[in-house]
Amino acid sequence: MKFAVVGTGVIGSGWITRMLAHGHEVIATDPSEGAYERMLTQVKQNWPYAEQMGLAENASIQNLTFTPHLEEAVKDADHIQENVPEVEEIKDAVLKEIDFYAKPEATIGSSTSGIMPSELQANLSHPERLVVAHPFHPVYILPLVEIVPGKQTSEETTVKAEQIYESIGMDVLHVRHEIEGHIADRLMEALWRESLHIVNDGIATTEEVDKAFTHAAGLRYAQYGPFMTFHLAGGEGGMRHMLKQFGPALKKPWTKLIAPELTDDLYHKVVSGSEASSQGYTMSELDQKRNEFLIKVKELAEQYWPSDSKAMKKSNGAELQ
């Protein structure tokens, strides 16, 4: 299969690494000055982690080509992944150009983290072949991709897209109804907003908030999500007991959810605290530590709770009809 990647920043380079690691040809495009050099540097930096996770027999960085011209990149591609800045006007213009030059049978995935697919489809001539395919950084390590069809997406496109992403080792999460932020980012945003309130109100520092998560819930969430975590919290009675005993606590004011005003004082607290927590490491060094940690955690989690995208979709389908 031949992939085209439009936009070669952090997310785009992550997609490129994953596609190459699974033995596919990739042609990338980005009109910004110095894009090729930055992309190649990033992919080469990512490659050792892809090697740790296992490469396809014919995987090679030599399967990557680059062109500054979008038409040349997408015209022969079987699947096109768009990763341009999260600005609707920019995405709209680029997607219209992709739609115009792509061959009829090609599918298009947008990496948007928050824009709904129906909005992205609005001005396309072939809206039925677009889905949102939202990944998580680092794309070459984290396997989840949220597939969100729009109002005009065909069932054929959705099925085909899921198969394509599974072919590059992704765990597909089919989002039934489009919503701003999809699923995972909405969950992370709730935690982020509450964290800002705690720092803003002087209850804890950024380091203490991070510790509260990494030394407790973060360790559990590496294996189980919130529902399985609370299911276990109910003891032998599981979730039934947990909801009966702790359900009333949902009425308590334990969360604010609405984000606090980002004042100069809060800005200073968050920035200075985060920089202090970096302990002098450069961002590149922190990236390396994170990547090595994620690979080991992912391998460990697989031993105790094997991920299976097909089982995930089957389970989800059984819950809501």
Curated annotation (Swiss-Prot):
GO cellular component terms, A-Z: cytoplasm
Main location: cytoplasm
InterPro entries on file: 3-OHacyl-CoA_DH_NAD-bd, 3HC_DH_C, 6-PGluconate_DH-like_C_sf, 6PGD_dom2, L-carnitine_dehydrogenase, NAD(P)-bd_dom_sf
GO MF assignments: carnitine 3-dehydrogenase activity; NAD+ binding
Main enzyme class: oxidoreductase
Residues binding NAD(+), per UniProt: G7, T8, G9, V10, I11, G12
Enzyme Commission identifier(s): 1.1.1.108
Function summary: Catalyzes the NAD(+)-dependent oxidation of L-carnitine to 3-dehydrocarnitine.
UniProt subunit comment: Homodimer.
Family per similarity comment: Belongs to the 3-hydroxyacyl-CoA dehydrogenase family. L-carnitine dehydrogenase subfamily.
Protein name: L-carnitine dehydrogenase
